């Protein structure tokens, strides 16, 4: 399971991050794909003549960078989140469309587009083709894509591709994005205001303290509950003005829905936990990351690497 968040500062800079929740690590690390790195898409999907530099979290398999989440130098970011039971992909390319393998979709987006507007326009003629990496299960995902202005959710299902405008700038897992947005209406009366004193008959009632207005916000770690809680937190967090404060906001917002070992078992009996939290700032073109066992937030600035190199860069954590 996973959670994603996007917001911007008063200068329009992107802050984008995610939790990755699972029972075991894939050996993920920070990967940098410089502008000069040569990458052939599986089905020949087109792109920029001079691609963007990309930084994010992922693994290298079959000599290919596979990003769980990533961003480019123009402030466009993308994350793949689990979507089983709803995601449905073709397994062969479709003639007359731009065919993109699901495992390379984050890199293809970040490498070739500068804004959500550009991505949304191009998706009209894109087919997402599920290519299963040898030794791995099929990845049944939906994607959260954001920039300094807005975010969208891309869900490929049996009835086609759905591209949703995400007005709360968050995403979790299944059910569909439409369900999550409809479900928010159950919490319209929730407030961050201090509850006013009231009277019931002859009894005068006063709040115990802050937080009474939040009564009803779900506290479990199921996908619908995390969506409600992170949407509430993201919508009510006070606007911040500098890099450190916004990175703090990002990690605290995602911290409100982190999964702790022992809280919830998966179908195989293993406990799910937040393996890592990652975040990106377009203000400084810096990726941030911490892990379950090391909560210290580490930073990886694009400026620290050769963005014109022809070599893929894997950064030891």
Curated annotation (Swiss-Prot):
**Which pathway?**
Lipid metabolism; bile acid biosynthesis
Q: Per the UniProt annotation, how does pH influence activity? A: Optimum pH is 6 for the hydrolase activity. Highly active in the pH range 5-7. Is stable at pH values from 4 to 8. At pH values above 8 and below 4 the enzyme is rapidly inactivated.
From its record, what is one biological process in GO terms?
Answer: bile acid biosynthetic process
Q: Which UniProt keywords are given for this protein, alphabetically ordered?
A: Hydrolase, Lipid metabolism, Transferase
Q: How is its activity regulated?
A: Hydrolase activity is competitively inhibited by the products cholate (CA) and deoxycholate (DCA), and by phenylacetate and 4-aminophenylacetate. Penicillin V and penicillin G show mixed inhibition. Strongly inhibited by thiol enzyme inhibitors in vitro.
Instruction: Please give the InterPro entries that the UniProt record associates with this protein.
Output: CBAH, CBAH/NAAA_C, Ntn_hydrolases_N, Peptidase_C59
At which positions is deoxycholate bound? 2, 18
Thermal properties of activity? Optimum temperature is 40-45 degrees Celsius for the hydrolase activity. Is stable at temperatures from 4 to 37 degrees Celsius. During 30 minutes of incubation at 40 degrees Celsius, about 20 to 30% of the activity is lost, and at 50 degrees Celsius only 20% of the activity is retained.
State the family it belongs to.
Belongs to the peptidase C59 family.
Q: How does it assemble?
A: Homotetramer. The tetramer consists of a dimer of dimers.
Under which name does UniProt file this protein? Bile salt hydrolase/transferase
Q: What is the lineage of its organism?
A: Bacteria, Bacillati, Actinomycetota, Actinomycetes, Bifidobacteriales
